[in-house]
C-alpha cells in the first residue's frame, strides 16, 4: 500500500521535472512551456509551408517526453495495484473475523477504483505520447489577449470552417486524425483486456463453493465493474474512430471551444 501511495505522488509530481532532464531541453515552469508553444505555433502557421520548425518541435517533443514519463509511472501503478489487489483478495478470503473481512473488502474496492483511475491516466498519456502535437495544442491559451496567437487561431478557425486548404492546416488535420486513431487502437486493446479480466474473475467466482458467498459476491462485483469499464472504453473507441474519419470538423470544434 505504501508503494502504491508513493507512486501516486510521483505520478503527479515527477513527470514535468523528469521530462526536463532528458536531452532536448526542458522548462522551469508550465507557463514557460506554454509561452514557447504559443510562439512556436504562431511561427509554424505563419510559415505556411507545413514544415514543423524547431520553434514548435522543441515544446512538442518536451510534451511527448512528459507523456512518456507519466505513462511509464501509470503503468507501474497499475501493476502495483494489481498485485495489491491479489494480496487483498487473499486477506479477504482468509479473514477470520468479520471486522477483518470488512476491512479487506473496503481495501479491495479502493484498490479497484484507484486501478481504474490509473488505467485512464495510462491510456490518456499513451495517446499523448503517440500524437504529441495535437495533445500540446490543448495547452494553447486561446482565450488570452495575446494578439499574435489570437490572430493565428482566428485564421485556423476560418480555414477549417471554409474548407480553405494549406500545408500547415493539412499537418494539423493529419495529426489530429492520428491522435484519435491512437486512442481508438488503445481503447480497443483496453476493452479487450477488461473483458478478458471480467471473464477470468467470473470463472474464478464459479470455482468457489457456495459456502464462500462473500468471496463470490466480491468477485462478481469486480467482474461487473470491469464489464462496465469495458463498455465505456468501447464507446470511446467508437467515438474516436468516427472522429479520425472526419477530423476537420472535430478540429474546428476544438479551436472554437478553446476561444
Regions found by a protein language model. Give the residues of each.
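Alpha-helical transmembrane segments of multi-pass integral membrane proteins
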Residues: 5-8, 108-124, 153-157, 228-232
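N-terminal extramembrane/targeting module of integral membrane proteins
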Residues: 42-103
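A cross-kingdom marker for long, charged
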Residues: 217-259
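Cytoplasmic membrane-interface segments at the C-terminal ends of transmembrane helices
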Residues: 16, 20, 79-106, 122-132, ...
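Polytopic transmembrane helical bundles with strong interfacial aromatic enrichment
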Residues: 2-24, 79-88, 114, 118-119
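Transmembrane alpha-helical segments and their cytosolic interface motifs
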Residues: 64-79, 108-113, 175-199
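Long, glycine/tryptophan/cysteine-rich extracytoplasmic
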Residues: 14-62, 66, 130-175, 242-259
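Alpha-helical transmembrane segments and their helix-start/interface "positive-inside/aromatic belt" motifs
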Residues: 1-9, 22-25, 99-115, 214-226
Amino acid at each position: 500500500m505504501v508503494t502504491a501511495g508513493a507512486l501516486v505522488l510521483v505520478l503527479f509530481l515527477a513527470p514535468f521535472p523528469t521530462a526536463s532532464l532528458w536531452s532536448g531541453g526542458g522548462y522551469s515552469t508550465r507557463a514557460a512551456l506554454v509561452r514557447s508553444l504559443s510562439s512556436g505555433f504562431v511561427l509554424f502557421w505563419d510559415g505556411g509551408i507545413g514544415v514543423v520548425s524547431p520553434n514548435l518541435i522543441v515544446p512538442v517533443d518536451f510534451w511527448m517526453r512528459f507523456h512518456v514519463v507519466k505513462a511509464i509511472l501509470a503503468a507501474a501503478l497499475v501493476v502495483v495495484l494489481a498485485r495489491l489487489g491479489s494480496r487483498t483478495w487473499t486477506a479477504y478470503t482468509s479473514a477470520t473475523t468479520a471486522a477483518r473481512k470488512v476491512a479487506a473488502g473496503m481495501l479491495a474496492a479502493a484498490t479497484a477504483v484507484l486501478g481504474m483511475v490509473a488505467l485512464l491516466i495510462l491510456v490518456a498519456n499513451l495517446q499523448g505520447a503517440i500524437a504529441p502535437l495535437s495533445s500540446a495544442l490543448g495547452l494553447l491559451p486561446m482565450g488570452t489577449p495575446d494578439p499574435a496567437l489570437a490572430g493565428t487561431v482566428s485564421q485556423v478557425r476560418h480555414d477549417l470552417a471554409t474548407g480553405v486548404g494549406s500545408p500547415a492546416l493539412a499537418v494539423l488535420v493529419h495529426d489530429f486524425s492520428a491522435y484519435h486513431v491512437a486512442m481508438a487502437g488503445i481503447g480497443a486493446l483496453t476493452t479487450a483486456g477488461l473483458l478478458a479480466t471480467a471473464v477470468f474473475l467470473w470463472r474464478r467466482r464459479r470455482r468457489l463453493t457456495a459456502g464462500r458467498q462473500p468471496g463470490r459476491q466480491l468477485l462478481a462485483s469486480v467482474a461487473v465493474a470491469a464489464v462496465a469499464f469495458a463498455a465505456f472504453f468501447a464507446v470511446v473507441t467508437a467515438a474516436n474512430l468516427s472522429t479520425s474519419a472526419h477530423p476537420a470538423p472535430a478540429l474546428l470544434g476544438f479551436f472554437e471551444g478553446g476561444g
